[in-house]
Amino acid sequence: LGGIHFFPTFIVFFCCMPMAQNFSQSYNWTIFLGFGLCIIGILLEIISDKQLHAFRKIHPSGTGIIETGLWNYSRHPNYYGEIMFWWGIFVFGFSFSGLNYLLLAPIAMTAMFWYASIPWIEIKILRTRPQYKDYQKRVHILFPEITILKRLFKG
C-alpha cells in the first residue's frame, strides 16, 4: 500500500523540481492555462466527491448507482478531475522549464488511473450492481465531453 501512495508523491516532486529552479521567470499564457487546469481539476474532484458522499448517505446499502450531477456525464468524474489536475501541473511546470521529459509525469498518472484504478473499481461495482451495465452504455468511463457529444449527436 505504501508504494501506491509513494508513486504519486514521487511524480509531484519530479514534476515540480524545474519550477523551483526557474520561478523568477516572467509569466506567459501557459502558466495561467496550467493553473486553470489545476483549479478546474480540483473543483471537479471536490464536487464529485461531495455528490458521491451525499448519495452514499441516502443509499447506505451500497446497491444504488449515482447518475446525477457530474456522474451523469462521467462514470468517474473524481478521477477525471485528478487527471486534469496532473496535466495542469505539467503545463505549469513545462512553462517554467521547457523540459519535455516532464510529460512522463501526467502520462504516468493518467495510465495509473486508466489501466489500474478505473478497471478495478468498474469490476468491483459490476460484481455487486448488475444494473451498472446500463449506466456503462449511457455514460463514458471518464471523459464527460464524450458523453455530451454522444447525446448531442444521438438525438
Identify the residue ranges that each predicted region occupies:
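Alpha-helical membrane-spanning segments of integral membrane proteins, especially the hydrophobic core
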Residues: L1-H5
